[in-house]
């Protein structure tokens, strides 16, 4: 426990929260270019081939971003929009690619939760 005299000499430092998505540099999203599009396997109890892309952002960071939804049209040199949000069973993947913007098309034949996958309303 500090004394009043110690507090007068040196004030308490506020706790600074560390950001979970440093590559975005306090922006909601960032544009980037795909360097490599590949699949990777998740952590222990799960089994799948998760689609991810290595993206070079305009903030000059290079990050691994998850491609949500079924099927995608991404390849090398595709321009994508990246948002924060980790994938719990993929270590090191702390970003998501936004579907339906720039070079990324929305998920085909999606009827529920369409806004999350950039799909237009079916006629």
Curated annotation (Swiss-Prot):
Keywords: Chloroplast, Plastid, Ribonucleoprotein, Ribosomal protein, RNA-binding, rRNA-binding. GO terms for molecular function: rRNA binding; structural constituent of ribosome. GO terms for cellular component: chloroplast; small ribosomal subunit. It is found in: Plastid, Chloroplast. Coiled coil: none annotated. Its main location: plastid. Belongs to the universal ribosomal protein uS12 family. This is Small ribosomal subunit protein uS12c. The lineage of its organism: Eukaryota, Viridiplantae, Streptophyta, Charophyceae, Charales. The gene is rps12.
């Amino acid at each position: 426990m500090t004394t009043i005299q110690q507090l007068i000499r040196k004030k308490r430092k506020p706790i600074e929260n560390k950001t979970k998505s440093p590559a975005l540099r306090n922006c909601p999203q960032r544009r980037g270019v795909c360097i490599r599009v590949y699949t990777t396997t998740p952590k222990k109890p799960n089994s799948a081939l998760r689609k991810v892309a290595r993206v070079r952002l305009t903030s000059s960071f290079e990050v691994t971003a998850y491609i949500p939804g079924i099927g995608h049209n991404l390849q090398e040199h595709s321009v994508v929009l990246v948002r924060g949000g980790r994938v719990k069973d993929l270590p090191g993947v702390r970003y998501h690619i936004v579907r339906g913007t720039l070079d990324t098309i929305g998920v085909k034949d999606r009827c529920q939760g369409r806004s999350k996958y950039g799909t237009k309303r079916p006629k």
